[in-house]
Amino acid sequence: MNRLFGNRSEPDEEAPLVATADEAMRPQIVQIFALVGEAMAGATHALLSGDRELAKSVVDKDKAIDALVNSLVNAAELQLVENESLNIADRRRLLTLLRILPEVERSGDLAEHIARRAARGLGVEMSPRSRGLVERMGEVASTIWREATDVIIDGKLEAAGAIEEIDDELDDLHVSLTAELTSGSMTLPVAVELALLARFYERFGDHCVNLARRQVGRNGPD
């Protein structure tokens, strides 16, 4: 049986989540985080540029993310059930992985939701101010995902504090965009779609916060 984790005698609680994964598992974890980051950036660009083909490619990319998540969930569950020689630290890493994967999958889903609206041409119907706010939300969303990736992939726990602050900016932008929607500068159907869009970006930030908290909690005291 292929081992996802080595059989070390001493637990290593401070290691990054994927630091001890073997070569069959680590690339998949790294790839998932990269795909989600690309999906969010691509969805925002497609929305603002009106590139419907790019939007459709982001939607298709979500299928790859879902497939990778399912593959890792199955592998992690198999290890927990069949590999009796895992030490405590490795078991905790696997359990943490099983907890963060749904957050990652949902983050990819949010990028897909944005891309679907881009494919329908929502971007061209936005007011200038709402467009500027959406552009900034996209930039902040990409930044917070990079920070979350650093925490999970590289174990840079110091980035967790920055994630909380970045999420606060996303929350503020969400409030600002919601206020803009009540100004009457856009039709009601467009305003409704933009309200959903703002919520998608805000929820994306929340998932990043949850990812960081799970990693920090894993390395914290029991």
Specify the residue positions occupied by each region the protein language model found.
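Cytosolic, long alpha-helical scaffolding segments
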Residues: 1-222
